[in-house]
Design a protein with these regions (language model features):
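Substrate-binding and catalytic surfaces of secreted/luminal carbohydrate-active proteins
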Residues: 50, 146-150, 157-165, 172, ...
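Generic structural signal for hydrophobic
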Residues: 52-53, 73-74, 111-114, 199, ...
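Boundary/entry segment of secreted carbohydrate-active catalytic domains
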Residues: 2-62, 370
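Acidic-and-aromatic substrate-binding clefts and catalytic sites of carbohydrate-active enzymes
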Residues: 40-44, 59-72, 89-100, 130-131, ...
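Cleavable C-terminal sorting propeptides in eukaryotic secreted/cell-surface proteins
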Residues: 470-494
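Substrate-binding cleft of extracellular glycoside hydrolase catalytic domains
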Residues: 70-171, 177-187, 275
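Hydrophobic faces of well-ordered beta-strands that scaffold small-molecule active sites
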Residues: 32-36, 59-63, 81-85, 120-124, ...
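Short, acidic/polar
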Residues: 37-52, 98-112, 189-193, 303, ...
Length: 494
């Protein structure tokens, strides 16, 4: 997801309130929008990513920060851009109009004037009112929005670039489970009203993130069918919610309309609501797989293509799919699935078939260069019980992505030797296949025989030209979540 916040415990309202936002605005059905995250050890080159977007009909892209390479690549492409101001800058921007003006100059004005980037909006913060933040950004968010708006006006961009705040669905709730009873969370009700009023008065819009997958992840008793969009003509699931004359057959509609009811209740129903993130991961959890992701996202694209909205907002909103690509350097604090939200793999290959706008099929990235066809695996004569292996595997997974080894994941059924080989290879590929990255106490060897098996794919990393990269300097230190992931694996090799 956009933020690293841990998944929140859900009350009864989880069935209607645990979704991430989709952009709601009139647009032709052939127009699609996607989140382009860049937290990867080997990011797909900007020009390749832009070509991938255009080949598949995406004409809007959302960036979580003003990534220079991504923004330059988006110049003169016709793709409309939402650029993010990260949470860590909220306090400084809130406290100084000058800081806001400097940020706008460096990250908005310059890219519009020098590179021809079609920046249409600035996302101030990302889910700043999450309960898990315990109010950390509440005082700074609205002043930051006001200062960024003032900076855009001063730069002559007040009509061209609009301000928004992407919010998590935990900012509103329904105490009895009916969308019509929706209201803002009591502790931030006044803040939400003031924020939305400012956005409405200044031509901005509201962005909401909705994740049906998280409803299922957070509650083992959540009705599975309610997480998906029902197929046309199919009977409603038993979990459907009756709200007066309206029957809600899926959690997205119920969640979105809970927000709309909250806005209407406070006289703010005129605000445009954009869904900033919605999607389904393909790995890292028993419910995160390609089949489930294909089912959910195809239902989503079918809704977009049909222009079908929700009972309270019949016109389908703009939807920023989360995400375009996998990101192997993201925090896994929310869960091991966090690195696997992409519709495309890290290299731009589709994970599953999809019918996009106008019935077109999903297309892979073009012009991707790969490293040599070789892998690092456990040496055949090495014993899995070698005492040096636990430390070697732990080190490999500290600096590379081993989330696919978790229970219920794509590589969760490997035997001990293959588990170790997978960890070794992930580190080897992340280090650009440097020979010394396959030197685990003489327990590993480089092979040209593909060790992939079943659903578990042993990667060959894309070639970014950065052959002096060392993984230890490029990856974040091991988190508690990573350590917990490794415990079952390490127990096998101790």
């Amino acid at each position: 997801m956009g933020s690293c916040a841990a998944v929140r415990a859900m009350r009864a309202v989880v069935w209607v309130a645990a979704l991430y936002p989709v952009l709601f605005r009139a647009r032709p059905v052939e127009a699609l929008a996607a989140n382009w995250g860049t937290r990867a050890l080997h990011p797909l080159p900007g020009d390749v990513t832009v070509r991938l977007l255009r080949d598949n009909g995406f004409d809007k892209a959302k960036l979580f920060e003003a990534d220079p390479a991504a923004l330059r690549a988006l110049g003169h492409t016709g793709i409309q851009v939402m650029v993010g101001l990260p949470n860590e800058l909220l306090v400084s921007v809130a406290g100084s109009v000058g800081a806001a003006e400097q940020w706008v100059l460096q990250n908005v004005s310059s890219y519009i004037s020098k590179y021809g980037v079609d920046i249409r909006s600035v996302a101030v913060g990302n889910e700043p009112f999450l309960k898990s933040y315990k109010g950390k950004f509440e005082a700074a968010t609205l002043p930051a929005v006001q200062n960024v708006q003032a900076a855009l006006v001063k730069a002559g961009l007040g009509r061209q670039v609009h301000v928004t705040v992407p919010l998590n669905a935990d900012v509103y709730e329904s105490l009895d489970g009916r969308p019509s009873a929706g209201d803002f969370r009591p502790d931030i009700q006044g803040l939400m009203v003031n924020l939305v009023r400012f956005l409405l008065d200044n031509g901005g819009f509201l962005t909401i993130n909705i994740y049906p997958f998280l409803s299922l992840y957070a509650d083992p008793n959540f009705p599975v069918e309610y997480a998906y969009f029902p197929a046309p003509g199919s009977p409603p699931s038993q979990a459907s919610v009756q709200d007066g004359n309206v029957l809600y057959t899926n959690v997205f509609d119920a969640n979105y309309d809970t927000l709309i009811a909250a806005l209407d209740k406070h006289g703010l129903g005129a605000i445009t609501v954009v869904v900033g993130e919605i999607g389904w991961p393909t790995d890292g959890d028993k419910n995160a797989n390609a089949a489930n992701a294909q089912r959910f996202n195809q239902g989503l694209f079918d809704r977009i293509n049909a222009g079908k909205g929700t009972p309270r907002r019949p016109q389908m909103p703009d939807v920023y799919v989360f995400a375009l690509l996998d990101e192997d350097a993201k925090s896994i604090e929310p869960g091991n699935f966090e690195r696997h939200w992409g519709v495309f793999n890290y290299d731009g290959t589709p994970k599953y078939g999809l019918r996009l706008a106008n019935g077109r099929s999903i297309l892979p990235a073009r012009g991707v260069r790969y490293l040599s066809r070789q892998w690092c695996v456990l040496r055949p004569e090495a014993s899995p019980s070698d005492p040096a292996l636990a430390g070697a595997v732990g080190y490999a997974c500290q600096y590379a992505d081993c989330t696919s080894l978790g229970a219920g994941s794509s590589c969760g059924n490997l035997d001990v030797r293959s588990n170790i080989s997978y960890a070794f290879n992930q580190y080897f590929q992340s280090a650009n296949q440097q020979k010394n990255a396959c030197a685990f106490n003489n327990l590993s060897v480089i092979t040209t025989t593909d060790p992939s098996q079943g659903t578990c794919h042993f990667e060959i990393m894309i070639d970014t030209g950065r052959h002096d990269l060392t993984v230890a300097s490029a990856a974040a230190a091991m988190t508690v979540a990573t350590a917990l992931l490794l415990l079952p694996l390490l127990s096998l090799v101790i």
